[in-house]
Regions:
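Transmembrane-helix exit segments and adjacent C-terminal regions of multi-pass membrane proteins
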Residues: 2-29, 244-246, 284, 291-300, ...
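Transmembrane-helix bundle of Major Facilitator Superfamily
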Residues: 2-12, 19-200, 378-379, 404-407, ...
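12-transmembrane solute porter fold
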Residues: 26-49, 274, 307-513
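Interfacial helix-cap and linker-helix signal at transmembrane-aqueous boundaries
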Residues: 54-55, 86-87, 171-180, 237, ...
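Helix-loop interface residues and adjacent transmembrane-helix termini in multi-pass membrane transporters
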Residues: 59, 89, 112-113, 144-147, ...
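Alpha-helical transmembrane segments of multi-pass secondary-active solute transporters
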Residues: 65-66, 95, 153, 187-191, ...
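A residue-level signal for alpha-helical anchor/packing sites in multi-pass solute transporters
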Residues: 140, 174, 202, 232-235, ...
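Hydrophobic transmembrane-helix bundles of small-molecule transporters
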Residues: 178-332, 338, 356, 364, ...
């Protein structure tokens, strides 16, 4: 067995062609990229509690309110894969800074929007800006850190994502209740201005430039196919539940599958046929000084290939030959199928099922936050002791147990107190803290630095598509139940099953992950 596994691994690269060990990352690098991560996570989830206020203030109808959420998600999902390639080609710091500046500007547009239409347009720009930043953050963490430092960096990334997601609800509730300067819901967007401007000042000082030495092409056919496919996939998933799944949503879903298949075929044909997608750099890949390809000079085509490529693929399909990458992507999909819908279902249950205001709902979310902070801050040490597979397994089982406790509280507790939900939320938070960082790090840990942007784009896209798909599927269950209490109970039970699916998929990861 060991011999067979070793035979599938690429031979180590000669010392001259290995990527040189990265210099110690500047001290301010991690805070800068994690600030952008926090801003994005906060902006996604703070809107959950701001919707009723902005709807009343702008006189927005249900369709406009839906597009405040949908416009951001659609632009984000459609742009992630392409943004990963832009970072590889033009420089991750440059693309990250562009995304950060655009996100800050769009936040001002949201905060000062005079109408629902203007707000939706600004949210679309926010989504595009978040798409520019997301893959660069993951690629920078992959290329700037190694070994134990990389594990700690991804643990901080997971901590930041969770804090933004969990406490975003509370921060939004506090801002709306405080009504600073009479801004109300607008402060939920305007809070990004000082944070974004401070981060922009730090980018030049703390963030070194990095890019693929091969300056890969943009693959315009691939960009068109994947952007159209993801738009056709995510749009009906967002609009379908509200509209009752009219014919056009079904046709869009069918078209998205066909377009994704065409994209996969195009990427496979464009990918060189050498067998070293991850781990070490294949022989002749990168000249140590010039960054040109060893076999083809400066053409930008991957070197060392034994077969001709028809172009530069947007996603190098050799990535999926690596078991850790492909199994990790599946685990990511299962995780975000559940988490993408859980926060929305809980917010709906608290505000419409239990009648809480934005601040009250945000306070309930602190139970998840406390559990999450306890485990996510020590995930790298737990992973070092247990390994990735066992850590994610323990986390998935804790999440399933927490969700089962929530279902029990929904079905059996009749006094109406929301604090009966606290034990289940706390246990779910403990599990979530053990999953987010390892399930992200395991996908990217073995990826070559030259492919970091492309791989990060895939991971970020899976997160967004998984979340949209989860919202659509769990939304059918939630809105189909009728009674709010039963709807919540049925939904969290289904989510518990999804966490068990995650635990099963983790078994596909290599034992040495």
């Amino acid at each position: 067995m060991s011999t067979a596994l070793n035979a599938r691994r690429p031979a180590p690269a000669p010392p001259a062609t290995k990527a040189a060990p990265a210099a110690p990352a500047p001290k301010g690098l991690l805070p800068v990229v994690l600030t952008a991560t926090f801003m994005t996570a906060l902006d996604i989830f703070v809107v959950n509690v701001a919707l009723p206020s902005l709807q009343a203030d702008l006189g927005a109808g249900p369709a406009a309110v839906q597009w405040v959420m949908a416009g951001f998600s659609l632009a984000l999902a459609a742009g992630l894969v392409t943004a990963g390639r832009l970072g590889d080609r033009y420089g991750r710091r440059r693309v990250f800074a562009l995304g950060l500046a655009l996100f800050t500007l769009a936040s001002a547009g949201c905060g000062f929007a005079p109408s629902a239409g203007t707000l939706v347009g600004a949210r679309v720009v926010q989504g595009l800006a978040a798409a520019l930043m997301g893959p660069q953050v993951l690629a920078i963490l992959r290329t700037a850190f190694s070994g134990a430092a990389q594990a700690r960096a991804f643990a901080r990334y997971g901590l930041t994502m969770g804090v933004g997601a969990v406490f975003g609800q509370l921060i939004g509730g506090l801002l709306i209740r405080a009504d600073l300067l009479g801004l109300g819901w607008r402060s939920c967007f305007l809070i990004n201005l000082p944070i974004g401007l401070a981060a922009l000042v730090m980018v030049r000082r703390c963030l070194p430039e990095s890019r693929s030495p091969q300056r890969p092409g943009l693959d315009p056919v691939g960009v068109l196919l994947v952007s159209t496919a993801l738009t056709a996939l995510v749009l009906p998933l967002i609009q379908g539940p509200r509209l009752g799944w009219p014919l056009w949503t079904v046709l869009c879903l069918g078209a998205s599958l066909a377009l994704l298949a065409a994209f996969a075929v195009h990427q496979h044909r464009s990918t060189p046929t050498d067998t070293a997608p991850t781990g070490s750099t294949p022989t002749g890949t990168t000249g140590p000084a010039t960054g040109t390809t060893g076999a083809t000079g400066a053409t930008g085509t991957t070197a060392g290939a034994t077969g001709a490529a028809t172009g530069t693929p947007l996603v190098d399909t050799r990535l999926f030959r690596d078991r850790a990458f492909s199994a990790g992507v599946l685990a990511q999909l299962a995780f975000w199928l559940g988490q993408g819908s859980f926060f929305l279902v809980l917010a709906l249950h608290l505000q419409f099922g239990r009648g809480l205001d934005a601040l009250g709902a945000g306070l309930v979310f602190t139970a998840i936050g406390l559990g999450y902070l306890i485990t996510s801050n020590t995930t790298h040490r737990v992973t070092a002791r247990l390994g990735v597979r066992r850590t994610i397994t323990v986390g998935g089982l804790l999440m399933a147990a927490g969700l089962a406790l929530l279902a029990l509280a929904a079905y059996e507790v009749s006094d109406g107190s929301v604090w009966w939900l606290a034990p289940g939320l706390f246990v779910d938070g403990l599990g979530m803290g053990l999953v987010i960082a390892p399930v992200t790090a395991v996908v990217l840990a073995g990826v070559e630095p030259r492919l970091a942007g492309s791989a990060a784009g895939v991971v970020s896209t899976v997160q967004q598509v998984g979340g949209a798909l989860g919202i659509a599927l769990i939304g059918l269950l939630y809105y189909g139940a009728g009674d709010p209490t039963a709807a919540f109970g049925h939904s969290v039970l289904a989510l518990a099953v999804l966490e068990l699916v995650l635990v099963a998929l983790v078994r596909l990861l290599p034992r040495t992950s």
